[in-house]
Amino acid sequence: MENASESPLKKYRRQPKVFFDLPSRGQFYTDGVLYGNTYTSLPVFSMTAGDEILFKTPDALVNGEATAANIRSCIPSILQPFKLVTLDIDAILVSIRMATFGPNLGITHSCPHCKSENSYEIPLQKYLDHYNRCEYNDTLVYGSLIIKTAPPTYADFTEVQKKTLSYQRALNINAPKITDEKQRDKYEHDILVEIGKLQVEIIVNAVKSIEVEGVIETNKKEIREFLDNSELELIKALKKHIEDNTMHWQVPLEKVKCANDECGKENLVKVSLDQSDFFDLG
């Protein structure tokens, strides 16, 4: 007869291992993205075997589905991962790694001075602390214009990533196969034009409103038309504004010391949070 009592396996199911706050502080989210619109003390579960396999599937990484599926699995209070802003994605990935593999990340680095291979353990909590100290600058003042911006959503980011990859393949793989020089030049020119359009698209998508003389314009069509016909200096200012925010949110370089007694020099190392290798080894 089947035992109707609670399964003894229940207490061995995944439990939250980490709790963290979203660095964006929920600033850019509408109802339904986060459960209860809560962005603090989010519980993080460790990855399952299936989650880890997804991170090793190239197509799922490129289209963002691997990351989105892992977020749904490990942080169920995030209801719509593709509507997350990119400011939160790295902190989310760090917290999932901590919940799955522990608080440290092992890295190797070849000393540029003596060529010795060194191994280091990097505490990941420092990155969560870094993100929580960061502030997103959402305002650009350009002459009489007050421009409000927002970081891209994860959906926008993955779309740009897919297009960028397809253009790179076109230039590196398809173009060299064209034997006629004029046709090849035209093909490459057309691809470069598309890349230029993509860069403008990133800038346009970042602009949420433009205020002039006390009137605020939020209509995306009007904003696009205005920017398409604006002077180059405004576009450059917007591009710099976006790049400055991106740089501000990047993981700081790690200062490490070479373990070779004959060297012992300090080096700065950039730690990669790219999903393809960040989750490769525990």
Give residue ranges: language-model regions.
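Long C-terminal interaction/binding lobes of large macromolecular proteins
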Residues: M1-G282
